[in-house]
Each structure stands twice: as structure tokens, then as C-alpha cells.
A protein has these predicted regions:
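Residues embedded in well-ordered beta-strands within globular domains across many folds
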Residues: 7, 116-117, 184, 247-250, ...
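Short acidic, glycine-rich loop/turn motifs
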Residues: 10, 81-89, 119-121, 281-285
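Short amphipathic beta-strand/extended segments with alternating polar/hydrophobic composition
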Residues: 20, 91-99, 123-138, 142, ...
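Conserved P-loop NTP-binding catalytic core
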Residues: 40-109
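Short, well-ordered strand-loop elements centered on a beta-strand within folded domains, enriched
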Residues: 90-122, 143, 257-280, 376-385
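Electropositive, glycine-dotted interaction segments
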Residues: 95-247
Length: 427
């Protein structure tokens, strides 16, 4: 499944945040605005779908996530998304969402009060068919292709219909239900890359093609090189383009003698690895390779981010987040860095956060969402109008400024006319 758009409301300081994803979508705002909250809100929304009923209840009671701004008190959490799903060679557009009441006062129990699922074939003239329709007191689903969305289904106050329908194998849209429950994103924080350079001796079981992740970078790179040599070559080529002082990326495995009776119990989710992996780089002018952990934090972080993008392409990940990539390389490389991210991420959406005028200047305004406070402390994000995109660039040039410099000068000026460039509603 490929994520096309999301909507988040009532999460931390976020209000009515609607993002339609481009290949690369960038959230731009001043420091400490709420950019990371958008990433957390997306992650929360999908994690909630996958969580158990008990975990859902805990998530709905998390005081760190409940809106605390005086303008948002009592606001429900809403999560909606639009995804594209390929089924039997045909593309379907899927709209799914839910709403719940937070446990924001003592004695109040959290409750899911709304849920919907709509699907249509992505062809001209097709209309959405409603497959799930839920309110606070009733829940319906469509039980047959020719029927209506009128079959009653009983669900608990902290249970989603889309979860319960996983057991209904006979449904004609069962594959869509399965895909919705299994959609994968990677919103992990990349700001600290050093820990990824360590190799763990205890790993999660089932470390196969589908579960490649960045929990252990040397092991990920070893598996990538072994199972997807073309992807490893692509990663290495992209990295050396940005850091030409490096000649080679080297990963080694050191076999361990782990006897069967020294393994963890059979039903444990972890096991001792049979090898320890180490990552090295060969730098021009040096006789011997150096351990990856000894190079600069920025260079490590860029490698981590590029690996994350490559892994997404072999792990069927729909969306990945990159926080402040401008902290990793000097400004002269911003353009090349963005180009490489775009090339490597084909088939996977990327959402970026940035507060760097110079980095933003290298972006296409059509993929930028600007963070604005219309009410004190409430974070909203707005895209540029089509006419505003060209006007922004032209106005920046007329002032002898880069586009990003002009944009941030308006963000810092409460009297600026920035709303003239944005798709601004009149709320």
C-alpha cells in the first residue's frame, strides 16, 4: 500500500493537519513549532491500528499526547488516511479513518466514536463504496459486494472494526482489510546515528527480507549486501557521491560459536546471533579502513538515512520520515542530497522536517507545508497555492533573496503577508 495523504487532529498541539504526499514532502516552520509532532501523530495513528485492545486503551489515556493547549482542550483525536492498493493488477483508492475521545479527565473512559472505510477502483467514473460506517453507538460493515453497508458488527469501545474484520476471510474486500492492518511506515528519529553503528549479540527472531530494519546497522548492511547486492551497490554509490573522500564501504561478519543449549528458550522472541557484524569505511590516503563509528556524526547520519531509504524499497515500507537532514551536510551539498533522496525513494513517500532557509531553497515549493500559528501555540500546516509557488520564487528574486530566506523572513514577521501565498481557509 502506498500512502497518498493523511489527516491528524487533536494530537499534542496539532489541529486539522492535512498532508497530501509528494515524492518528497517537507514540513517547514520555526524552531519548537510542532513539526516533529506531525511525524509522531502519523506514527501514533498507524500504531493505534495495530495495537491490541488493551494497548489501545493505554494509548488513549496517554497524558503526554492529549492536547493541553487552551484552544484544544476537549478535542478528540482524529486520524484519516488515503492509500493506493494494488490488487490483482488493478489499483484501488482506499480512504480510512477513525476518531476517539481521549481519557482527558478523571473517571472518563476513552472511547472510539467514529470509523469509516471507503474504497473505489482508481478509474474514471468510479465512485467510493462505503465498507465500514461506525458511530459512537453502532457499527456497520458491508457483507457482500451487491449489498449495502448495513450489516451490524459488535465492537468494544476501544476496538476497531478494521481489526475485527480480519477474521472475516469470506469478505470480498478481505485483502484490503489485511493490507490496512499491515501497512508499514518508518518514522524513527535519525538525529543520533552513533548507536546504529553497534552490533548486538542478541537479535529479534525472524530477521528475514521482510523484517530488515535499522536497529542494528552493521547487520542490516551485511544482509543488504548478501541478499540485495544491487541495492547495496546503489547505496554505496550514492554515499560516495556525497562523501568522495571515502572509497569503499566494508562490512564484515565474525562468526560466534553459540551452542544450541546456550540459546534462549524456544518461545522467546529473541535469540543469540551466530555472528557479530562490523562496519568500516576506506578513506582516501589511509592504508587501513577505519571503523564506521569513528567518522563524523554528520557522515554517519547521512549513511543511516540513505540506508533507511534503501531498506524501505525492499521491505514494502510506505512512508519514511527524515528529521532535519540539513544538520548532516554542509549547505553546498543540499541540492545533491535532495536529488539522491528523491532518486533512492522511488516507490516510497518521504516526509522531511526542516528549519533551514538554505535547505528549503533547494526544494520545490509544491512539496512544502508551512507551519503557522493562527491561535497561540496551535500548530497548523498549509501548502502553497499553485499561483503562490511561482510568486514566492519571483518575490524572493526581486528582493535578492533565496526562496528559503524569504520564506523564513515572513515566518519570523507576524505582520508579513505569508498567507497570500498559501492555501488558507477562513477558520
Amino acid at each position: 500500500m502506498k500512502i497518498q495523504a493523511v489527516f491528524i487532529d487533536g494530537f499534542k498541539n496539532l489541529a486539522n493537519v492535512r498532508i497530501t504526499f509528494d515524492n518528497i514532502t517537507t514540513l517547514v516552520a520555526l524552531n519548537d513549532f510542532g513539526k516533529s509532532n506531525v511525524l509522531s501523530g502519523i506514527d501514533f495513528g498507524l500504531s493505534f491500528i495495530k495495537a491490541s485492545i488493551e494497548d489501545k486503551k493505554d494509548m488513549m489515556s496517554n497524558s503526554q499526547l492529549i492536547p493541553g493547549n487552551c484552544n484544544l482542550i476537549g478535542r478528540n483525536y482524529k486520524y484519516e488516511m488515503e492509500v493506493a492498493a494494488d490488487i490483482d493488477g488493478r489499483e484501488y483508492l482506499v480512504q480510512y479513518g477513525y476518531e476517539f475521545e481521549w481519557k482527558d479527565t478523571e473517571g472518563k473512559e476513552p472511547e472510539i466514536i467514529s470509523e469509516f472505510l471507503k474504497v473505489k477502483l482508481n478509474e474514471k467514473g468510479q465512485k467510493y463504496a462505503q465498507l465500514i460506517n461506525r458511530t459512537a453507538h453502532t457499527a456497520f460493515y458491508k457483507s457482500s459486494e451487491t449489498g449495502r453497508c448495513s450489516s451490524i458488527i459488535k465492537v468494544g469501545e476501544t476496538e476497531l472494526v478494521v481489526n475485527k474484520l480480519r477474521a472475516y476471510d469470506e469478505l470480498y474486500y478481505a485483502l484490503i482489510i489485511t493490507k490496512l492492518n499491515g501497512i508499514k511506515i518508518n518514522m524513527g528519529n535519525n538525529l543520533e546515528a552513533k548507536s546504529f553503528c553497534q552490533s548486538d549479540s542478541v537479535i529479534r527472531k525472524g530477521f528475514d527480507n521482510a523484517s530488515i530494519n535499522e536497529d542494528n546497522l552493521p547487520q542490516v548492511i551485511y544482509r543488504l549486501k548478501s541478499q540485495y547486492p544491487d541495492k547495496f551497490a546503489l547505496l554505496k554509490e550514492a554515499y560516495i557521491q556525497l562523501f568522495p573522500e571515502f572509497e569503499e564501504i566494508i562490512v564484515k561478519d565474525f562468526q560466534l560459536n553459540v551452542e544450541e543449549d546456550h540459546q534462549l528458550r524456544e518461545n522467546a522472541p529473541f535469540q543469540f546471533t551466530i555472528a557479530v557484524y562490523a562496519l568500516f569505511v576506506k578513506r582516501k590516503g589511509l592504508v587501513n579502513p577505519v571503523n564506521f563509528s569513528t567518522i563524523s556524526d554528520g557522515a554517519r547520519r547521512v549513511f543511516m538515512i540513505l540506508t533507511k531509504i534503501i531498506v524501505a524499497s525492499v521491505s514494502n515500507i510506505s512512508l519514511i520520515a527524515i528529521e532535519e537532514p540539513d544538520n548532516s551536510v554542509y549547505s553546498g551539498l543540499f541540492g545533491a542530497y535532495i536529488r539522491i533522496i528523491r532518486e533512492l525513494s522511488a516507490g516510497c513517500k518521504v516526509i522531511i522536517t526542516s528549519h533551514s532557509p538554505y535547505f528549503v531553497s533547494c526544494l520545490d515549493p509544491s512539496g512544502i507545508y508551512v507551519g503557522i500559528n493562527r491561535k497561540a501555540g496551535v500548530a497548523e500546516f498549509f501548502p502553497f497555492k499553485k499561483s503562490g509557488q511561482k510568486q514566492l520564487v519571483n518575490d524572493a528574486v526581486s528582493l535578492d533573496l533565496r526562496m528559503g530566506e524569504y520564506l523564513f523572513s515572513m515566518l519570523a514577521d507576524s505582520e508579513s503577508n505569508i498567507r497570500d501565498y498559501l492555501e488558507w481557509d477562513n477558520e
